[in-house]
Amino acid sequence: MAQGLIEVERKFTPGPDTEERLQKLGATLEHRVTFRDTYYDTSELSLMLSDHWLRQREGSGWEFKCPGVTGVSGPHNEYVEVTSESAIVTQLFELLGSGEQETAGVAAVLGRLKLQEVASFITTRSSWKLALSGAHEEESLLTVDLDSTDFGYAVGEVEAVVHEKAEVPAALEKIISVSSMLGVPAQEKAPAKLLVYLQRFRPQDYQRLLEADSSGEATGDSVP
């Protein structure tokens, strides 16, 4: 993904007929893949508590998701996705305040920034592309991902990618429309894979995120 694009996404709980509904809507199955995601944070969860998410995806490299548009309510999220390692390192040093920045890749600065693995799991994903209202441009397509994890959790996501904040409301309308056509209840909020992983395997960290969310310090439902 190009640097600085804004992801607008909504998670949902897939049903037994979700793929059939996608086919009836004219969606195209792009691929089925299996990959491992590993998330990193400090022991104090400094990144997650500020709604920043550092992930290394097997075969794809590093990705850092930062808060995007604010002030748009509802069961959806907006993130700016950073994939350039130099840009990720710059933002990590700014957030974690660890002195003079190094010129190095992400893996090389994990120790200095006291970042450690907090979650690692395997996902099997079927990824679909769907055009609405006859739109055929690549950036007008919506992506629908259906994921199942090696710890027994399944979740779906409808995603649009835009360049500017002004484009977010229109993208959100498309996401809401597709979600409705897939039979997703209007206010459904399906938890992210990472949150469910923490709830099951690191309950103390999960509780810290919930407490911060309830106090307005973090957004527990907005895990990418």
UniProtKB/Swiss-Prot annotation:
EC number: 3.6.1.28
Cofactor(s) for this UniProt protein: Mg(2+)
Protein keywords: Acetylation, Cytoplasm, Hydrolase, Magnesium, Metal-binding
Cellular component annotations (GO), alphabetically ordered: cytosol
Main location: cytoplasm
Enzyme class: hydrolase
InterPro entries tied to this protein: CYTH-like_dom_sf (IPR033469), CYTH_domain (IPR023577), THTPA (IPR039582), ThTPase_euk (IPR012177)
Protein name, entry field: Thiamine-triphosphatase
Organism: Rattus norvegicus (Rat)
